[in-house]
Amino acid sequence: MKFFRGSSTGSDQSPRQTTAAKMTRRSSGMGEISRTLSSEETLCVLDLGATSPNNIRYFTDRGHKPYSEDVLLSSIDPALVTKDDEGNRVMDERRFLAENLVYPAAHFDVIFCWNLPDYMDESLVKPVVGRLWSILKPGGLLLAFFHTKDAGPDAPCYRYHILNNDTLEMQHIVIPAQSARGALAGESNFRLQRVFNNRHIENLFRDFANIKFFLARDNVREVMVVR
């Protein structure tokens, strides 16, 4: 696994989505999951990221019940920083899970994880994936994006908005620079923390029943896993 130095900024504010020209990308994983979302049955869908009117509309137009939670923003709260037995800086995973992703077991039919594992602090990734497993129904689907080895530490973090069954709009997420709550002024971007290879991705989702990789494009590989 390839790691990058640097960290994200803690902030009381929500991530700001830049007004630069918006980009779109075709998503094979989205295309696959859209078949499930075409079901006449009402599904519970968890969209991890800042509230997206596009995504809410896409889900509700199909009769589904959407939930949204910005777990990445919550993960950079400086109050979560602690030290392990060796004195290494880690995040307090127990506190984080007590305050975030608090849903009944086997509650969701579909979870859009997007690029969360690539930008979240290393000590939180496995606990969060474990929590996602527990709140996803057996047979439920999870979609995640992972950067390839060609991506650098400054690879921008995007919020993905669903335009149609296989097309996503990408908006660069920027955190307002400030020095409040111990944040370092001038650090305004989520930084790519690591690059997972296929073996690491398989290990991350080892408790899931099935995993499917889609052909990577734009230095991003898409992964769909089944609970």
What is the role of each PLM region?
Residues 116:
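Hydrophobic adenine-recognition pocket in adenosine-nucleotide-binding enzymes
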Residues 124-141:
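A short glycine-rich, Lys/Arg-flanked "PGG" loop and its adjoining helix->strand segment in the class I
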Residues 46-49:
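Conserved S-adenosyl-L-methionine
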Residues 42-44:
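Nucleotide donor/acceptor-binding cores
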Residues 1-37, 52-102, 141-227:
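Class I (Rossmann-like) S-adenosyl-L-methionine-dependent methyltransferase catalytic domain
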Residues 111-112:
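Hydrophobic beta-strand segment of the Class I
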